[in-house]
C-alpha cells in the first residue's frame, strides 16, 4: 500500500496537470470565439459573391472562362487536406485523415490520378505512414492564418486547373456549422458549379462585359472558399481542443477526489495504528 507521502505527491502532480489542462481549455475557448466571429463575419460576403458569379456562369453561350471548363471525364484531381500541427484535440485530426484517405482510395479505384497537398504536421505524418506521397506540404498555418494563406492556395490551384493539369480541386477539412456541430467533409472547389440554366438574370446589363466581370470575380470566389475552409478548420480545431481539455480537467478533478479519499483512509489507518501501539505499550507497563 502506498504511504501518505507518496499519495500526497501524486495528488500534487495531478493538481499541476489540471492547472495546465484548465489553462489550455481557457485559451482554446478564447481562440475559438475569436475565429468563429471571423467565420460568421465572412459568410454574407462569400455567399453573395458566390451567388453573383454563379448567376454569371449560368449565361450559357455568353461567358467563356478557363475556370468554367467542365471535363467530360476527371483524370486527375488535386486534394488539399487540412489538419493541425498539434494534437490534444480529440479526434479532430484522425477524423479528417481517415476521410481523406478514404477519398484518395475512392479516386484511385476509379482510375483517377490524385495529387495530394497536405496542411499540418498531423496529416503529413499520417499519410507518410500510410505510404501516400504528398506533392506539397505546409506547416505554417496557425490560428492567425487568413486571406494571405487562402490566396496562396487559390492561386496555385487556379493555375493548375486553368492549365488543365488537374480536372478537379477538392478540400478535405472540418466544416464548422456551429459551436456544437463540426463535421469532416470533402468539398469540391473546381470546376465551379454555375446556377441552374435560366437562373442568370438576362435583364441585367453588365459593364464591362460578363466575361470581364467573371474574370475578376471567379478567382475571388475561389479565394473566399479557401479562406472559409482555413478559418472553419482552425475554429473546429480550437473547439475540439477545448472539449478535450475540459474532459481532461474533469478527469483530473475526479482523480484528485479519489486520491484524497485514499490519502485520508491511509492517514487515518496510520493514526489508528499509532494510537493502538501507544495503548498497548501503556498496558504492558501496567
UniProtKB/Swiss-Prot annotation:
GO terms for molecular function: ATP binding; proton-transporting ATP synthase activity, rotational mechanism. The keyword RNA-binding does not apply. Its main location: membrane. It is found in: Cell inner membrane. It comes from the Bacteria. Disulfide bonds: none annotated. It is a peripheral membrane protein. GO terms for cellular component: plasma membrane; proton-transporting ATP synthase complex. Keywords: ATP synthesis, Cell inner membrane, Cell membrane, CF(1), Hydrogen ion transport, Ion transport, Membrane, Transport. The keyword Cell membrane applies. InterPro entries: ATP_synth_F1_ATPase_gsu, ATP_synth_F1_gsu, ATP_synth_F1_gsu_CS. GO terms for biological process: proton motive force-driven plasma membrane ATP synthesis. Pfam families: ATP-synt. Produces ATP from ADP in the presence of a proton gradient across the membrane. The gamma chain is believed to be important in regulating ATPase activity and the flow of protons through the CF(0) complex. Belongs to the ATPase gamma chain family. NCBIfam families: ATPsyn_F1gamma (TIGR01146), PRK13427.1 (NF009960). F-type ATPases have 2 components, CF(1) - the catalytic core - and CF(0) - the membrane proton channel. CF(1) has five subunits: alpha(3), beta(3), gamma(1), delta(1), epsilon(1). CF(0) has three main subunits: a, b and c. This is ATP synthase gamma chain.
